[in-house]
């Protein structure tokens, strides 16, 4: 521990299916009665609501895509619905058969059914473009030229595209044409894609948007995923990896809230931990003056001691991996004037940097090019150096608490003793205020996309800021934060989660959108100084504590139901 004096839910798919089945059953009864002798038992045909008609059309479109055309015909006949307007059906068939003149005539019939008649020009342009490309592929250059000059150009639409199309006349063979036009060639594939574009101009009452049912199902699954507190994996957008028969729910047992390992090799307080950018290693720094590099086993995700980096004159309070993970820089506490730059692969010290014995170098950040880094401390030092420790630039009078290099390679963010984060440019020596807090900023980190900053604020806890809009987005509740330096992190799939240590010996995890913690992790017996989430393994997390241990957190072990019920693991849910 380091002291510092500064709506509504989506309908279940099964429910929708039952509703449709009931509606169809009613119509089926009518059909059965109609086929009889006209007796008094003839059932009155149910009048379908607009929503019911829409669902039947969606099902019909989906079945048609599966090739179940007879089933579609029976469904439309029995329900009394129409899958699409008869003019749209003709238009579809003519496009798929490549009968371009007939398809163009069909547009005249569809014009009266469209909300925007001007869209006819755009649709005609797309039709003629396909016609032109198919002529070129067939080697019919004269016919293609006639389409270009006599049909496309008179439309006076998208002249830039016409100039591009004219250049395809110079293609020597069909493969050259396909490559330059980024077009797959004449056939069902390109015509289907053309039809998808054309359908966007037609109202859904005339022709449904392409694959509409799949789109709705995908949206429903994505919404369920977004509402799932513990969702920490990537979903396949094809829907093949999910069940549509049940709502999507992730179990807490799949979340990294169970102790997998307790690393006890340090012999004093552990102040910092950080996974490498490729997720294959973990570096831990301790008050015992050592840095330990741990190897993450790819199959088991167990950590094994790789090497110990020794020789530091002070405890190690901060670590920074180079972008390529070849080097690691170690910093000490306030009274440390040295930086240690290690080659992690060989275990050799490359540079021990010190500008003055009066310096305080407590924070460091790598430039994205991996050839430079910035460092500073609360005594007013703010340097940019190369890999050999040579001073490249300096900024006077900035009392640095924490540093971060932005992805543009020019801007450096620095929190200072004035309770703010400012952006500095060493190129033109300009700076600007980005974040202003009312209490000291003990540490901060930035999301991968550079948009969000996560701050640990003295006596306040964890705050989320939008760096682009320069606004406070959220204050996360639960954590105990005094004037000790605690490091939080983004993590999980798509960085949807936030984790932080706490002075009450716990690790807190929040979903990024929720102020209340979803999980509290207990097990440490003293302040938890730092949490690091593996950037490549969403289910792996590490925490470093003043109790001298590093805990590795992962999903629940494979236990049977009885064992899981009796598991005395230190993971408690905070959702309500």
Swiss-Prot record:
It comes from Danio rerio (Zebrafish). This is WD repeat-containing protein 26. Residues 21-34 have a biased composition (Low complexity). The keyword Isomerase does not apply. The modification Phosphoserine is found at residue 49. Keywords: Cytoplasm, Mitochondrion, Nucleus, Phosphoprotein, Repeat, WD repeat. PANTHER family: WD REPEAT PROTEIN 26-RELATED, WD REPEAT-CONTAINING PROTEIN 26. Residues 51-83 form the LisH domain. The lineage of its organism: Eukaryota, Metazoa, Chordata, Craniata, Vertebrata. It holds the Pfam family LisH_TPL. Forms homooligomers. Identified in the CTLH complex that contains at least MAEA, RMND5A (or alternatively its paralog RMND5B), GID8, WDR26, and RANBP9 and/or RANBP10. Interacts with DDB1-CUL4A/B E3 ligase complexes. Residues 1-20 have a biased composition (Polar residues).
């Amino acid at each position: 521990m380091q002291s510092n004096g500064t709506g509504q839910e989506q309908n279940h798919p099964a429910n929708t299916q039952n509703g449709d089945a009931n509606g169809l059953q009613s119509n089926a009864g009518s059909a059965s009665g109609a086929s009889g002798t006209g007796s008094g038992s003839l059932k009155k045909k149910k009048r379908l609501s607009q929503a019911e008609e829409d669902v039947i059309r969606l099902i019909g479109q989906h079945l048609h895509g599966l090739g179940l055309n007879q089933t579609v015909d029976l469904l439309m006949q029995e329900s009394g619905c129409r899958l699409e307007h008869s003019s749209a059906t003709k238009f579809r068939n003519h496009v798929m058969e490549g009968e371009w003149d007939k398809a163009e005539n069909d547009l005249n019939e569809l014009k009266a059914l469209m909300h925007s008649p001007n869209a006819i020009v755009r649709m005609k342009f797309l039709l003629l473009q396909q016609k032109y490309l198919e002529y070129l592929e067939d080697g019919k250059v004269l016919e293609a030229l006639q389409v270009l000059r006599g049909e496309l150009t008179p439309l006076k639409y998208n002249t830039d595209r016409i100039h591009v199309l004219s250049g395809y006349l110079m293609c020597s063979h069909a493969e050259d044409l396909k490559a330059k036009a980024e077009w797959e060639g004449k056939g069902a594939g390109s015509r289907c894609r053309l039809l998808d574009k054309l359908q966007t101009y037609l109202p859904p009452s005339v022709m449904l948007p392409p694959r509409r049912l799949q789109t709705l199902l995908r949206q429903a699954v994505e919404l369920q995923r977004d509402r799932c507190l513990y969702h920490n994996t990537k979903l396949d957008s094809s829907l093949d990896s999910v069940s549509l028969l049940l709502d999507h729910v992730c179990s807490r047992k799949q979340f990294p809230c169970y102790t997998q390992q307790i690393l006890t090799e340090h012999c004093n307080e552990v102040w910092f931990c950080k996974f490498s950018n490729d997720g294959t290693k973990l570096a831990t720094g301790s008050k015992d003056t050592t840095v330990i590099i741990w190897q993450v086993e790819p199959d088991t995700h167990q950590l094994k001691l790789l090497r110990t980096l020794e020789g530091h004159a002070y405890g190690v309070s901060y670590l920074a991996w180079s972008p390529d993970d070849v080097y690691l820089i170690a910093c000490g506490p306030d009274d440390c004037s040295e930086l240690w730059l290690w080659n992690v692969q060989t275990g050799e010290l490359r540079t021990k940097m010190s500008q003055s014995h009066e310096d305080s170098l407590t924070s460091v950040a790598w430039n994205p090019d991996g050839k430079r880094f910035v460092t500073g401390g609360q005594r007013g030092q703010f340097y940019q150096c190369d890999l050999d420790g040579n001073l490249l630039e300096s900024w006077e009078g900035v009392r640095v608490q924490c540093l971060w290099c932005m992805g543009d390679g020019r801007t450096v963010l620095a929190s200072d003793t004035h309770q703010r984060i400012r952006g500095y440019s060493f190129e033109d020596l300009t700076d600007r205020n980005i974040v202003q807090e009312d209490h000291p900023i003990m540490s901060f980190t930035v999301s991968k996309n550079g948009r969000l900053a996560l701050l640990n604020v003295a006596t306040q806890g964890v705050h989320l800021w939008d760096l682009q809009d320069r606004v406070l987005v959220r204050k996360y509740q639960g954590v105990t934060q005094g004037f000790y330096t605690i490091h939080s992190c983004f993590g999980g799939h798509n960085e949807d989660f936030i984790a932080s240590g706490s002075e009450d010996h716990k690790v807190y995890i929040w979903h990024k959108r929720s102020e209340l913690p979803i999980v509290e992790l207990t097990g440490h017996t003293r302040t938890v100084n730092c949490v690091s989430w593996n950037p490549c393994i969403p289910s792996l997390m590490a925490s470093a504590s003043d109790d001298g241990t590093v805990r590795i957190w992962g999903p629940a072990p494979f236990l049977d139901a009885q064992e899981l019920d009796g598991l005395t693991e230190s993971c408690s849910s905070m959702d309500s």
